[in-house]
A protein has these predicted regions:
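Catalytic-domain carbohydrate-binding cleft regions of carbohydrate-active enzymes
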Residues: 1-159
Length: 159
């Protein structure tokens, strides 16, 4: 059913300075009031902004005060929420050292004792290595803790 229904998406709402959660919920209400069916919303990466950068597995609580309450409200409106996640982690990420300790990044081909650094949309970053069991296990752990446990199942794995 959802694969055939309308899925809203906008960078505008998640990029608001504050109360993005209320803005998205209001958008869903407006669409329904206009008689247009909506089955979900693809949540762009603004929810994960930390110090002006996209830092996944974090929540910007100025924009989304209570992720669990937000997802519960979306589910109550029968609008499945699909948050954006990305496979690159910026070097400035507040949990970057934790990720390094978990050995989750692609290795530098010239210096295999360390992770590789590449250009990412927000600056220098390292890329998650899904080919390693440690990488997959850590991805599952962080995704579950920060996104799935908040009340949604699908994610939009971008870039």
């Amino acid at each position: 059913k959802r694969a055939l229904g309308y899925q809203g998406s906008s960078m505008y709402y998640p990029e608001l300075e504050k109360d993005s959660d209320d803005a998205v919920l209001g958008f869903i209400d407006t669409i329904k009031e206009e008689g247009f069916p909506i089955d979900g919303f693809h949540l762009s990466s603004g929810y994960a902004t930390y110090n002006g950068k996209r830092c996944f597995f974090t929540w910007n609580t100025d924009r989304f005060k209570d992720p669990k309450a937000y997802f519960a409200a979306m589910n109550e409106k029968h609008a499945q929420n699909v948050p954006n996640v990305k496979p690159g982690m910026l070097l400035c990420h507040p949990r970057f050292d934790e990720f390094v300790k978990d050995d989750v990044f692609v290795r530098d081909s010239k210096h295999p004792e360390t992770y590789g650094v590449g250009k990412w949309w927000g600056g220098d970053g390292a890329f998650w290595d899904y080919t390693k069991p440690e990488g997959r296990a850590a991805w599952k752990k962080y995704l579950t803790e920060s996104i799935i446990a908040a009340g949604t199942d699908p994610v939009w794995h971008d870039n």
